[in-house]
């Protein structure tokens, strides 16, 4: 019976690890999603800014304004590059968290299987004991009957 308690404790610990891993995976996915949204926003802003530049150029702009546009576009490109790197890092974090969750889930399933096997074995042993008692009772009853 002590082993049954130990298995239950180990299974409970494994369940907590799975919950913690799932929580971490959720946080990593939210971070990745935010990074994707920020990158999309920057790219959209860059496209909008380029369109404004094209419109202004067709109307004619000064060289100073042209230089300002170019510098700002370069700054946006650097920011986009940095956000792409961040997104790659978040994607790696999600992959690591997902693998960790899968590993912990597999471990939990192993503990559950062991606990089920132990319960089945205990039930089988109890049934055998009951059958043995019934057989002994029937044997004694048969011995007491006068023939």
UniProtKB/Swiss-Prot annotation:
Membrane topology value = Peripheral membrane protein
Listed GO CC annotations: bacterial-type flagellum; bacterial-type flagellum secretion apparatus; plasma membrane; type III protein secretion system complex
Q: Where in the cell is it found?
A: Cell membrane
GO biological process, alphabetically ordered = bacterial-type flagellum organization; bacterial-type flagellum-dependent cell motility; chemotaxis; protein secretion by the type III secretion system
Q: Could you name the domain of life of the organism this protein comes from?
A: Bacteria
Q: Name one Pfam family in it.
A: FliJ
**Primary localization:** membrane
Record Gene3D superfamilies: 1.10.287.1700
Its biological purpose: The FliJ protein is a flagellar protein that affects chemotactic events. Mutations in FliJ results in failure to respond to chemotactic stimuli.
User: According to its UniProt record, which protein family does this protein belong to?
Assistant: Belongs to the FliJ family.
Q: What is this protein identified as?
A: Flagellar FliJ protein
Q: Which organism is it from?
A: Escherichia coli (strain K12)
